[in-house]
Structures are given as C-alpha cells and as structure tokens.
C-alpha cells in the first residue's frame, strides 16, 4: 500500500518539476525579451523625432530645387 502512494507522489513531483522548468525556461526569458523590446521602442521614438527634422529640411530643399528648376527656360 505504501508503494502505491510513493509512486503517485513521485509522478506528481515529476509533473510539478516539469511545470516549474517550463515556467523558468520559457516565461522568464520571454518577459526579459519583452522588456528589452519596450526599451528599444522608446529609443526608436526618440530617433524618429530627430529624423523628422532631417526629413523636413529635405522637403524644404526639394521645394527650393523645384522652384529653381521652374525658373529655367524649357528647351
């Protein structure tokens, strides 16, 4: 009778250890990766803000070039 309970106890321990191992080696790294991607998104937003000024200057130069080319006569 005692061996039956011991066997059930061992099976339950194996199942519990497997669940814990799945949690430690699956959920925790995904949480770390999610945190890292959130940090990267924050820096990306700042980079896009600095690129906006560059793109605005580029559009202004493009409009100036179009204005300059429109003054040339057509051949």
UniProtKB/Swiss-Prot annotation:
Expressed by the venom gland. One of its GO terms (cellular component) is extracellular region. Residues 1-22 form the signal peptide. The modification Lysine amide is found at residue 41. The keyword Hydrolase does not apply. It comes from the Eukaryota. One of its GO terms (biological process) is regulation of defense response to virus. Its main location: secreted. It is found in: Secreted. Residues 42-75 form a propeptide. Keywords: Amidation, Antimicrobial, Antiviral protein, Secreted, Signal. The keyword RNA-binding does not apply. Belongs to the non-disulfide-bridged peptide (NDBP) superfamily. Short antimicrobial peptide (group 4) family. Shows a low ability to inhibit hepatitis C virus (HCV) infection in Huh7.5.1 cells. This is Peptide Ctri9610. It comes from Chaerilus tricostatus.
